[in-house]
Amino acid sequence: MQEFDIIVVGGGHAGCEAALASARMGMKTAIFTISLDTIGVMSCNPSLGGPAKSHLAREIDALGGEMGRNIDKTFIQIRVLNTRKGPAVRSLRAQADKMAYANEMKKTLEHTDNLSVIQGMVSELVVEEENGKKIIKGIKIREGLEYKAKAVIIATGTFLRGLIHIGEINFSAGRMGELSSEELPLSLEKIGLKLERFKTGTPTRIDGRTIDYSVLEEQPGDKSQVLKFSNRTKDEDALSRRQISCYIAHTNEKVHEIIRNAKERSPLFNGTIQGLGPRYCPSIEDKIFRYPDKNQHHLFLEREGYETNEIYLGGLSSSLPVDVQEEMLKNIKGFENAKIMRYAYAIEYDYVPPEEIKYTLESRTVENLFLAGQINGTSGYEEAGAQGLMAGINAVRKLRNEEPVILDRADSYIGTLIDDLVSKGTNEPYRMFTARSEYRLYLREDNADLRLTKLGYELGLVPEEEYQRVEKKRKDVKIITEILAKTNVGPSNPRVNEILLKRGENPIKDGSTLLELLRRPEVSFEDIKYISEEIRGIDLQGYDHDTTYQVEITVKYEGYINRALKMIEKHKSMENKKIPVDIDYDDLKTIPKEAKDKLKRIKPINIGQASRISGVSPADIQAILIYLKMRGN
């Protein structure tokens, strides 16, 4: 019987990050997947990034994860969203060559030391009882083999009792054309895990040769600047990638009428589908009935790769019958002759309510069993990858008897994601938004490396060279800011008012520092560099764009950032008030039973976490603080 330190079940985005983290930290690791051909597959949209999701991807990269580097090697378009808004919500988004992304991820797994990649459907978890505790001991696969493990990470995506719906037709599948896992959920229930149902969906894929692009709005990529998800990607490699345009189309009243007439044939509305779907990624029929006054909805045409004609039609996710899908498509401008290559469908699947896991992503029921990705009730590749990385890290540290890594919501979007899941739970597939973070002006995608690379380095996931690069950037930002603060300029420097007038700013009559000039909304760091060329002894050349952009953001938004840092300081004081593991909530007579039950189940490790649990009031928190003070904590 083969034996591993850690076994990962599932080869999706969570599973890949978990397996790589475990193996790179020195553990003998195996990743099991139903099919080796679908490792790292993008089940729905062939893209990474977008608001808050790019923040997660950048944080994964800063901690030493793989997702950012993988998309940089395989993107076919990249651009920045929300450029007219503030830096907190600006986000990078890349369109992937779907097949290349999966192949590159598989190659990375296969070339990683300490990692075995095995095809096999896991049918059962081997759990034993020791000293009254359930402890994971390994797995069994349908092929009849058993494997021992000290820890197991479950990252099964939509495959647990997956049920696909297309109109009146439904059938078992984990993804279209792939087997669902029917035995593993039974094993999870047998060992005491609670399972519930969620639903998601995916749109039609169209033959790109049958679309009339001349009547659509083009969305080109951005080749004017270096754009990349990973700081370890070379600038020249990112710039050299060939980019393909995306396009925008729209539905119309005729399409909406077709959908309204087919309402009773939609499993979403006729009672066939029981699981709740993602509110922020609704099907087209959901949008039509939820927003009856809207006479059109955007559709996004995104190529699935260099070597395919398949076009992903974002915004047209559906569970309607195929004849209705055909009819509504032909009534969209530009799609009169369009041919469908893959039909849209909805899928229901099992998930474990996230209140069942600890902040480390370990199960509360079975020791050394970790859960990551959609099984925890989330939606999205980046959300899955973030959980996979943290599950891998914490599984390793648990086996080494080391302190767990629990990221604070004030330090990262990953921390916000996990804290939201465990403290609040979710009644729909959870998707990350910048609005979910109260510290979003500090938690920007551009400073993810400054926030988290040191931790990734200490964990052994970030190489020395990358760590030193980030530390140099930190030092350079400070040096440049100090130079700007102490360098005075006046109207005698002809370039000062030249730039100010060109940017629509008021010219100066008296002296100013370069720092004060940079605070002006329309003045960029490039402008400051231009002005500084006329100042003897000042050299602002030779710094990379990443560093100078960081200077510009911190200078322009200094007041807001300082306000956010004060909020974080206040938040940290709550997070630093630890709750003893042996606390007996029954001793707190003033706390209602409902709140006590939640506190007992979730077991918050500090006052901050306790305060965010749904159903726990400020009065309950005050009672806990008084109790801890009386105990001398």
Swiss-Prot record:
Cofactor: FAD
Compartments reported by the entry: Cytoplasm
GO CC annotation: cytosol
InterPro entries: FAD/NAD-bd_sf, GIDA_C_N, MnmG, MnmG-rel, MnmG-rel_CS, MnmG_C, MnmG_C_subdom, MnmG_C_subdom_sf
Binding of NAD(+), residues: 277-291
GO biological process terms on file: tRNA methylation; tRNA wobble uridine modification
GO molecular function: flavin adenine dinucleotide binding
Keywords per UniProt: Cytoplasm, FAD, Flavoprotein, NAD, tRNA processing
Pfam families: GIDA, GIDA_C_1st, SAM_GIDA_C
Chain residues that bind FAD: 10-15, 122, 181, 374
Record's function text: NAD-binding protein involved in the addition of a carboxymethylaminomethyl (cmnm) group at the wobble position (U34) of certain tRNAs, forming tRNA-cmnm(5)s(2)U34.
Family per record: Belongs to the MnmG family.
NCBIfam families hit by this protein: mnmG_gidA (TIGR00136)
Record note on quaternary structure: Homodimer. Heterotetramer of two MnmE and two MnmG subunits.
Protein name: tRNA uridine 5-carboxymethylaminomethyl modification enzyme MnmG 2
Species assigned in the record: Fusobacterium nucleatum subsp. nucleatum (strain ATCC 25586 / DSM 15643 / BCRC 10681 / CIP 101130 / JCM 8532 / KCTC 2640 / LMG 13131 / VPI 4355)
